[in-house]
A protein has these predicted regions:
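Basic/polar N-terminal segments that are highly enriched at the extreme N-terminus
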Residues: 1-17
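Conserved active-site segment immediately N-terminal to the catalytic lysine
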Residues: 193-206, 216
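Active-site C-terminal subdomain of aminotransferase-like
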Residues: 29-30, 206-268
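General beta-strand structural signal in soluble alpha/beta enzymes
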Residues: 22-24, 73-76, 99, 122-123, ...
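A glycine-/small-polar-enriched, mobile loop at the entrance of the PLP active site in fold-type I
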Residues: 19-76, 80
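Active-site phosphate-binding strand-loop segment of PLP-dependent enzymes
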Residues: 131-187, 200, 208
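Conserved beta-loop-alpha segment that forms the PLP phosphate-binding cup at the N-terminus of a helix
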Residues: 68-98, 102, 106-111
Length: 268
């Protein structure tokens, strides 16, 4: 067996991916400067030099999101993990959540709600059209006990963009916090987290940021974090529990070890 493993290792070729111009719904082309940055020497995720870079990364993400939210950070996993970070922390068993579906990723939001024990109230629009503000307003009036409004800002599956500013205003008028999918929209279209009073938002580095896949920028305001801190039940995911992650990524945190961050990916 040992000789077979050795033979396999000797015959394996280094992978040389073909050069492509990426035009699909997945990753975008990555600039050579970013690829070069990821090839730099690996240092520890608690190294003072890396901690300094973490602070710079947070500030850069704040600018892109147009926010001063203290908890603005990159989740060490792709955009789907950013989505789960929002729902795992903000949805408790029995919570009623109004979720807008006008494409694939609204459907994924609904699945997250049910997996975390929430009750999904669906507002459905035709694929390729924007989320109807009138339908959302009616759904919230019909469900005054709803705690969250969740919607996709720009649906990757169709390209349809919805009025995030108006939807957030409707949510707050009905005492709901908002979860916004900005995987496709961040850095690609106007997005103002603070001005539009978005409570929780997630994105991905592989779309309009034209960076490597595998990182999910997220941002939470104080209204969202208050709900996280006041949960009656523990967050079901240890890895995504913001109460733990804030010790590493939170503003003024001691950078307490939680998990090994993807150091070289964050260089990019």
């Amino acid at each position: 067996m040992a000789s077979l493993i050795l033979l396999t290792l000797k015959t394996m070729q280094s992978f040389n991916p073909p050069i492509r111009t990426l035009m699909g719904p997945g990753p975008s082309d990555v600039h050579p400067r970013i690829l070069s940055a990821m090839a730099r020497p690996t240092i520890g995720h608690l190294d003072p030099a890396f901690v300094g870079m973490m602070n710079e990364t947070k500030e850069g993400l704040k600018y892109i999101f147009q926010t001063e939210n203290e908890l603005t950070m990159p989740v060490s996993a792709p955009g789907s993990a950013g989505m789960e970070t929002c729902f795992a922390n903000l949805v408790e068993p029995g919570d009623k959540v109004v979720v807008c579906i006008n494409g694939v990723f609204g459907m994924r939001m609904k699945e997250n709600i049910t997996r975390f024990g929430g009750e999904a109230v669906v507002v459905e629009d035709d694929w390729g059209t924007a989320v109807s503000t009138d339908k959302v307003e009616q759904a919230l009036k019909d469900n005054p006990d709803a705690k969250i409004l969740a919607f996709v800002h720009a649906e990757t599956s169709t390209g349809a963009s919805s009025d995030a500013k108006a939807l957030c205003k409707i949510a707050h008028n009905n005492d709901c916090i908002t979860i916004v999918d900005a995987v496709t929209s961040l850095a690609g279209t106007e997005l103002r987290v603070d001005e539009w009073e978005i409570d929780a938002i997630y994105s991905g580095t592989q779309k309009c940021l034209s960076a490597m896949p595998g990182i999910s920028p997220v941002s939470f305001n104080e209204r969202a974090l208050t709900k996280v801190r006041n949960r009656k039940t523990p967050v079901t995911s240890w890895f995504l529990d913001l109460n733990l992650v804030m010790g590493y990524w939170g503003e003024g945190a001691k950078r307490t070890y939680h998990h090994t961050a993807p150091v070289n990916t964050l260089y990019g």
